[in-house]
Structure formats: structure tokens, C-alpha cells
Amino acid sequence: MEWTLSPAGRFAATALLPPLLLLACGGAGQASRPAATPKPGQSEQAAMPLPPWASSMKVAIQSPADGAKITANQVPLQVSFSGFQPSCDLAGTANVQGTGHYHVEIDKSLVDMFCAPSATISMQNVKSGTHTLTVLPALNDHAEVEQNAKSVSIDYEPTQPLAEIAPASVGTPSIKIVSPKAGSTLNGAFDVWVQASNFNVTCDLEGKPDVAGYGHWHVNLDSTSGPMMGMMTMLRMSCGNVLHLSAKGMTPGRHTVIAFLADNQHAPLNPMIEDKVAVNVAR
């Protein structure tokens, strides 16, 4: 069987992004994934096959059950995986057999990447009614194994609905990398600290319709261009002022750490708002 690579959800719209898939192997109690619409960069990725071992990367949604009624404003998601060991430390670096992570979508829109068995999905700005949660195995470079996606349907009927977040007028947004400093040497774990101004960062809106003045930020290594709009080099995304990262999968030598503001759909703001610093990765 030939396995093809596609843009990682809306990961493809950013660094991406992920952005996000066509076919799910439905297991017991898990709904087949509805057909997705074409995503940015899909045509350029169609001819790029996944490595043969990617077919063994499997996920299963342990909870919520398919058809579950959700009355809270967050959905606890429990995922099991086989055929790979999730490692967020390797995200955005070269693919290695047996490692990766998983992406979560709500209604075919990427929320975030995860590496732990448990994740929490906010229902902020989500209308009541039926929605679909999808989990997809992903390689280090965020290529999704769409054939092994799993989905469940939920009925969101909140007992205390959240007030909808409305557009905000915040002035001209900016982002500045506070740490690491230019010329720093990275070895093992390191943090990227940023200062975002005139921009409201929130995880609760990830994967939801865009809201002016709101979003989050991504960190890429060396590039924000190329296949899937640079998604292959996205290390992580954040809605705070710090990201805990690792140089574990990076090649030794000089690299550029790039931080940029992204909207709820993971696309960079237009015009792009970014900051970058040159660093060295220890040999």
C-alpha cells in the first residue's frame, strides 16, 4: 500500500500548519472521519510519500465515547497510541522511525499537537450541537498519517455556556524574542521567552473561527517557508509567554529560531509579525 503525505491540518496554514484529512480507519465505537476539504499546500504534498513505517503509527480515542453528551465547557480527551512513542522534543526536526506526536482537530480544524495520553479541548466560541473530534498520528515534521485517523462525535449541550469572545481593537501587534539571546549555544532543554504586544494570546480559541486581535504564536527552526508553508520546521506553538523546547533532534551548528504571531486557524498574521535570533546548537 502506498501512503501519501498531506499537509498537517491547518498547521499547514502557518508554519504549517497545521494547519489538517480524508479517511479514518474507524474502530469500535469510533465514527468514520467525514471528508475534508482541500488544504493549503495539499497539491505540493500529494506526491511526497510517507515512509513505509508510518503505517504502523496508530491512535485510538479512549474517551469521550462516540455520541457522548458534553455539558461542561471543556472536553477531556484520552488517547492511546501504538507503533510510535510520542515526543514533542522532536517536533519540527527530522523524522525518526518510532517517534512522532498526534494532532487533534475539532470539526476538521486543527487545535494543537500533543504528546501525552491526556488532552483538554476548550469549547470556547463553539456553538451547541454535534461536533467531531479527530485524532491523527503525526511524524516529527507534522506530516499526518491520515489513514490512521480516529474520530468521535460529541453532542455539546453546555449547562453554563461560555460568553463568546468578540473581536478586539488592540493596535499594531508585535512579538519579540526575549530569550535565547542572539549567539546563544543550545544544548538539551531550553526555553523560548517572548513578549507579545497588542495581541491577545489564548489556547481556548485554537482551531476555532478567527477573532480579530486574538491568536497565539509559533516557533519555527530556520524557516517559515517551503512545503506546507514551513510546517515541517515548526517546533511548537504557545499561548503564554514561554515555550519549553529541546535541541535534541536539531543538527549541530548555526540555526535561526523564529517566533511569529498566528491566528486561531494557525495562519501567520498578514503581514507576518515575527522575530528571529541566530543560535548555535552544541555538537
What spans do the regions from the language model cover?
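Bacterial signal peptide processing site
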Residues: 26-29
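C-terminal substrate-binding/catalytic lobe of Rossmann-fold NAD(P)-dependent oxidoreductases
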Residues: 32-36
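C-terminal motif of bacterial Sec signal peptides marking the signal peptidase cleavage site
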Residues: 22-24
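Short, compositionally biased P/S/T/A/G/V-rich stretches that sit at domain boundaries
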Residues: 40-72, 157-187
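Bacterial N-terminal signal peptides that target proteins for export
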Residues: 2-15
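N-terminal leader/capping segments at the start of a protein or of a new domain
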Residues: 38-39, 134
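Long, low-complexity serine/threonine/glycine- and acidic-rich segments characteristic of extracellular
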Residues: 52, 76, 82, 86-160, ...
